[in-house]
């Protein structure tokens, strides 16, 4: 191995060391004078941008929370209003149902009364027709039995009325089996 010289030692400055030092200091000066302030300015701008974005995000979050609270309050108010509307509609529906039931009941009562009146009128016509028929049959039968003419109208009327009164009296005392319907005695119209 050859002997080492002082020039081989890297710790010992060589002839270019002064030039290297001057270039290094010049680069350091340029960096310190132009590049570092530029980088610091850009870092400060970036820092300011991040800070403003953070504040804006915080403000937006606060506004969103306030809007959410307002939304919840409005939603609660809308739900309460919907409940009131539903209850009012239910009450109105119940009232309408009650009115319709009452109207239907009145209409049914009116129809029943009209039917009863019609039945009474039909019954009265039937009773009158039966009385007339029974009267003429009774007069004819009585004429045959007695063997004399009962042409006198006044006399016929008295006989028929007496005969019908006796029939009605018997019917009231002993209701016939055909007069019982569903366990209840039918009403007899006596006129």
From Swiss-Prot:
CDD domains the UniProt entry points to: ATP-synt_Fo_b
GO cellular component: plasma membrane; proton-transporting ATP synthase complex
Coiled coil, from the record: none
An example molecular function term from Gene Ontology annotations: proton-transporting ATP synthase activity, rotational mechanism
Region Disordered: start-end pairs: 170-191
Topology versus the membrane: Single-pass membrane protein
Subcellular location: Cell membrane
Keywords recorded for this protein, A-Z: ATP synthesis, Cell membrane, CF(0), Hydrogen ion transport, Ion transport, Membrane, Transmembrane, Transmembrane helix, Transport
Segments traversing the membrane: 10-30
Family in the record: Belongs to the ATPase B chain family.
Quaternary structure, from the entry: F-type ATPases have 2 components, F(1) - the catalytic core - and F(0) - the membrane proton channel. F(1) has five subunits: alpha(3), beta(3), gamma(1), delta(1), epsilon(1). F(0) has three main subunits: a(1), b(2) and c(10-14). The alpha and beta chains form an alternating ring which encloses part of the gamma chain. F(1) is attached to F(0) by a central stalk formed by the gamma and epsilon chains, while a peripheral stalk is formed by the delta and b chains.
Role played: F(1)F(0) ATP synthase produces ATP from ADP in the presence of a proton or sodium gradient. F-type ATPases consist of two structural domains, F(1) containing the extramembraneous catalytic core and F(0) containing the membrane proton channel, linked together by a central stalk and a peripheral stalk. During catalysis, ATP synthesis in the catalytic domain of F(1) is coupled via a rotary mechanism of the central stalk subunits to proton translocation. Component of the F(0) channel, it forms part of the peripheral stalk, linking F(1) to F(0).
Protein name from the UniProt record: ATP synthase subunit b
Organism whose genome encodes this protein: Acidothermus cellulolyticus (strain ATCC 43068 / DSM 8971 / 11B)
């Amino acid at each position: 191995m050859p002997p080492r010289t002082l020039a081989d030692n890297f710790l010992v400055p060589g002839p270019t060391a002064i030039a290297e030092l001057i270039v290094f200091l010049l680069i350091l000066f340029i960096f310190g004078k132009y590049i570092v302030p530029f980088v610091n300015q850009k870092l400060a701008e970036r820092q300011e941008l991040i800070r403003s974005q953070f504040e804006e995000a915080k403000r937006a979050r606060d506004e969103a929370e306030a809007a959410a609270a307002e939304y919840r309050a409005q939603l609660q108010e809308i739900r309460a209003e919907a409940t009131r509307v539903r209850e009012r509609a239910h009450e109105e529906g119940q009232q309408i149902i009650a009115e319709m039931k009452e109207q239907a009941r009145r209409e049914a009562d009116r129809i029943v009364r009209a039917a009863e009146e019609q039945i009474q009128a039909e019954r009265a016509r039937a009773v009158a027709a039966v009385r007339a028929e029974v009267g003429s049959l009774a007069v004819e039968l009585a004429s045959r039995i007695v063997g004399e003419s009962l042409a006198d109208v006044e006399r016929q009327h008295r006989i028929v009325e007496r005969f019908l009164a006796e029939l009605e009296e018997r019917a009231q005392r002993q209701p016939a089996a055909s007069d019982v319907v569903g366990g209840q005695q039918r009403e007899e119209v006596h006129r």
